Amino acid sequence: MFKKFDDKENVSNCIQLKTSVIKGIKNQLIDQFPVIEQWLNQIMPKKDPVKIVRCHEHIEILTVNGELLFFRQREGSFYPTLRLLHKYPFILPHQQVDKGAIKFVLSGANIMCPGLTSPGAKLYPAAAETVVAIMAEGKQHALCVGVMKMSADDIEKVNKGIGIENIHYLNDGLWHMKTYK
C-alpha cells in the first residue's frame, strides 16, 4: 500500500476535523481495538487538533498535532501506524515470523504460512481478517502491520500460500513521512 508512497507527491489535502467527527472516529477505534479505550485520551488528547490527510488511492491518514496515528483506505477500517504501535505495542494482537522472513517482510512481501509455522516463529490464535502486529524472532518492535488472510488454525493446517497480508512495514513511504502539519 505504501511501497511507492511519497508525502510530497501523494498527499492531496489536509482537513481539520469537527468535534462530532472526532467522537465518531474515536468510537470506531474503540469498536475496532477494544484494548485502546483506556489509552485513547492519551493518544488523542481532547484539546489537540485532529486532522485527516487525504492521499492518492483513497488513503486517509489520521493525525494529531502532526503525528501520524492511524490510516485507512476507502472509508474502511483503521490501521495503526508503526510509530504508534511502537509506543503502544499492546493495541494489536501479535504474530511472530522467523529470522528468515525478516528481509522479505521489510521489502513489502506478504507473510507466507511457512514463515509463521517454522521454528522461531510463534503463531497465536487469531481469526481471519484480524489486524495484527508482525514481530520478528529476536526483535523487540513490530516490523509491520498486517491482516490475517486465514485463521491461525487454517495456517497450521494448510501451511501454504499467504497467511498475512502486509499493509504497512518499516521503511515504507508512510514510515518515512515523519509528521504532517
Swiss-Prot record:
InterPro entries given in the database record: MCT-1/Tma20, Pre-PUA, PUA, PUA-like_sf, Uncharacterised_CHP00451
Entry keyword set: Cell cycle, Cytoplasm, Growth regulation, Transcription, Transcription regulation
Top-level taxon of origin: Eukaryota
Subcellular location(s) of the protein: Cytoplasm
GO molecular function annotations of the record: RNA binding
PUA domain segment(s): 92-171
A GO BP entry: formation of translation preinitiation complex
Record carries keyword Membrane: no
GO cellular component: cytoplasm
Record-linked Pfam families: Pre-PUA (PF17832), PUA (PF01472)
UniProt xrefs under PROSITE patterns: PUA
Role, per record: Plays a role as translation enhancer and involved in cell cycle regulation.
Domain notes: The PUA RNA-binding domain is critical for cap binding, but not sufficient for translation enhancer function.
PANTHER family reported in the protein's UniProt record: MALIGNANT T-CELL-AMPLIFIED SEQUENCE 1, MCT-1 PROTEIN
Sequence similarity: Belongs to the MCTS1 family.
Name of the protein this chain belongs to: Malignant T-cell-amplified sequence 1-B
UniProt organism field: Xenopus laevis (African clawed frog)
Taxon lineage: Eukaryota, Metazoa, Chordata, Craniata, Vertebrata
